[in-house]
Amino acid sequence: DGNVIEEVSGKDLPPLKGKDIAVHPDKVTYVARKDGYVIFDENKYTIDIQDVLVIKGNVNRLYGNVFYDGTVRVKGNVGEGAIISAKGDVIVEGYIQSAYVSAGNNVVVIGGVNANDSGYISAQGGVYAEYLENAVVYAGQDVKANYILTSRIEAGTEITVKGSKGVICGGELAAGCK
């Protein structure tokens, strides 16, 4: 099934260039010199190791769980049932919905959090979001949002609500929990 074709001599590719990589003596294998996320640029023919894992879409149950030793940046949303755990920061450019997010440093949500009383956000540093609705949040330091609705928040230092609305409505909040 199929046609047999004559082999054609290929062209050797030049070795890849990049930061934080070493070329194995076989000149085919590349080894990272540090922990991180591998970035291959086909146009520049380079390979780099970055401390930030950039996810260019949404994280959800179909995408799979994310466990990373550095910082995780999600360019989309974090959907229901998703799990993200990072030793650095977790930065979400969209919103978080009923997910489990933990960070060794800060959690920053450019959009907001609507957890529908499911999931949690936990950070050894601070938690910063546009809004927190029906969320469970544990922060080793401060929590800042424009408004907080019916959420359970524990902050190591302080809870700040800012912006023109600056509302806290319902829920349980505790600050200075270090």
Question: Language-model segments: what does each one mean?
Answer:
Residues 159:
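Phosphate-interacting basic helix/loop segments used at nucleotide- and nucleic-acid interfaces
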Residues 1-155, 167-178:
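Charge-rich, low-hydrophobicity low-complexity segments
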